[in-house]
């Protein structure tokens, strides 16, 4: 078992896993995820494979249509996590243990700086080394000093940070979900239209109410921003939280995040002889802008002389344009105004707001993991330096002081530092 863990702790094995994960993520970025089988049959046909091999059968066989949720991708993440844990225990911890040990020696090997000097100022040299931030220990006539032990400990936290990120990714793949809802103003809804989910996903039964929806426009009638005011409703029907969301400003409640994504117009509410009725609209586009069309009948459908007016809506400002049967603009009507002979009154635009709801149980692991990763990566670049001093007593009260030093980084800086400490103490 120990041999297996040593193989897992091998750097080449970890790099190979990282390479496989990177290639897999690349495929996940190129191939559209969580689409229907017909979509892949249409875009990845057997007759003209992309790259000479990528067809819908290959995608379906290797589950490339939902890469981040399939078993072999999660297995790669788990393998990398186990490799990092093994590396931490078999390589990092022994190195830390060695670094914390007081390693006294008269002649250490492979040093970056070495000098001998006759001086009566050995005490001053030791004090100077301590003032440079070294922790100095004494054993009889030998001294040992270390500096930057955090640089040896930080790689352990780098590994732990990556493990946190991997755990967060696995939790998100297994238990997260994504839902798209189109909800009318004033309606209460539950999460239903789930577009993607993991095998261990548990859908929330949280009730949400859309209190209002509105749009801000630029002076040229281009949409500036659209907003939805949402309320979180508890089991007793009481509002526990409310917030106005917009694009890039979501509502976060417990493990749910509500994003503003889209909007649409469903119809118009018209009043006729003190009775309200609704007429649907058809959406089309004109110069890449949304336009809605509808037809308002002015007489009964059973009448032989059926007449009506065509209505066009091109924004959500509350204005409609009425055209006659010849396609000529008849009039422009605002909300609460009459359309025809004071019998038909425009009451309301019937709109829906697009809300994307996401649940990611691993998001905290990922955030903390990246936070620790940034800090620990910076700390891991700190040099770990060691200094050895050996004292030999000579005749006439003279002292021969042997100074050795080495570091794992910034070797030139260490050599310069030791030279400055010793040059005036001869």
From Swiss-Prot:
InterPro entries per the UniProt record, alphabetical: Cyt_c_bgen_Ccs1/CcsB/ResB (IPR023494), ResB-like_domain (IPR007816)
Annotated membrane topology: Multi-pass membrane protein
One biological process term in Gene Ontology: cytochrome complex assembly
UniProt keyword terms in alphabetical order: Chloroplast, Cytochrome c-type biogenesis, Membrane, Plastid, Thylakoid, Transmembrane, Transmembrane helix
Pfam families from the UniProt entry: ResB
Subcellular location, principal: plastid
GO-annotated cellular components: chloroplast thylakoid membrane
Localization annotation: Plastid, Chloroplast thylakoid membrane
Residue ranges of the TM segments: 11-31, 70-90, 153-173
Keyword DNA-binding included in the entry's annotation: no
Family, per entry: Belongs to the Ccs1/CcsB family.
Assembly mode: May interact with CcsA.
Function: Required during biogenesis of c-type cytochromes (cytochrome c6 and cytochrome f) at the step of heme attachment.
Name used for this protein in its record: Cytochrome c biogenesis protein Ccs1
Native species: Heterosigma akashiwo (strain CCMP452 / OLISTH)
């Amino acid at each position: 078992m120990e041999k297996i863990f040593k193989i897992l702790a091998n750097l080449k094995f970890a790099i190979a896993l990282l390479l496989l994960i990177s290639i897999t993520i690349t495929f996940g970025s190129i191939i559209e995820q969580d689409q229907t089988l017909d979509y892949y049959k249409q875009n990845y046909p057997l007759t003209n494979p992309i790259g000479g091999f990528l067809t819908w059968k290959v995608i379906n066989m290797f589950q490339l249509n939902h890469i981040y949720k399939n078993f072999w991708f999660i297995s790669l993440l788990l393998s990398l996590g186990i490799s990092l844990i093994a590396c931490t225990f078999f390589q990092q911890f022994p190195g830390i243990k060695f670094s914390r040990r007081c390693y006294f020696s008269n002649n250490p090997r492979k040093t970056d700086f070495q000098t001998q000097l006759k001086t009566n100022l050995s005490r001053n040299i030791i004090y100077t080394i301590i003032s440079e931030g070294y922790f100095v220990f004494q054993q009889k006539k030998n001294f040992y000093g270390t500096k930057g032990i955090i640089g040896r400990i930080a790689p352990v936290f780098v590994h732990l940070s990556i493990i946190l990120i991997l755990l967060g990714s696995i939790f998100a793949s297994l238990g997260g979900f994504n839902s798209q809802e189109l909800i009318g103003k004033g309606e209460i809804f539950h999460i239903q239209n789930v577009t993607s989910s993991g095998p261990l996903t548990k859908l929330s039964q949280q009730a949400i109410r859309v209190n209002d929806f509105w749009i801000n426009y630029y002076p040229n009638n281009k949409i500036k921003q659209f907003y939805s005011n949402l309320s979180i409703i508890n089991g007793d029907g009481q509002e526990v939280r409310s917030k106005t969301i917009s694009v890039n400003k979501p509502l976060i409640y417990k493990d749910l995040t509500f994003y503003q994504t889209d909007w649409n117009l469903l119809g118009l509410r018209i009043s006729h002889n003190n009775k309200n009725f609704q007429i649907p609209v058809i959406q089309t586009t004109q110069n890449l802008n949304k336009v809605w069309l509808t037809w308002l009948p002015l007489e009964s459908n059973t009448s032989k002389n059926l007449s009506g007016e065509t209505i066009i809506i091109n924004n959500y400002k509350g204005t409609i344009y009425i055209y006659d049967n010849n396609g000529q603009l008849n009039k422009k009507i605002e909300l609460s105004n009459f359309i025809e002979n004071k019998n038909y009154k425009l009451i309301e635009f019937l709109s829906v707001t697009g809300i994307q709801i996401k649940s990611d149980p691993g998001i905290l692991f990922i955030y903390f993991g990246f936070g620790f990763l940034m800090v620990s990566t910076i700390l891991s670049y700190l040099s770990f330096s060691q200094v050895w001093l050996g004292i030999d007593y000579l005749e006439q009260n003279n002292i021969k002081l042997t100074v050795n030093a080495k570091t794992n980084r910034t070797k030139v800086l260490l050599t310069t530092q030791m030279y400055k400490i010793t040059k005036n103490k001869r």
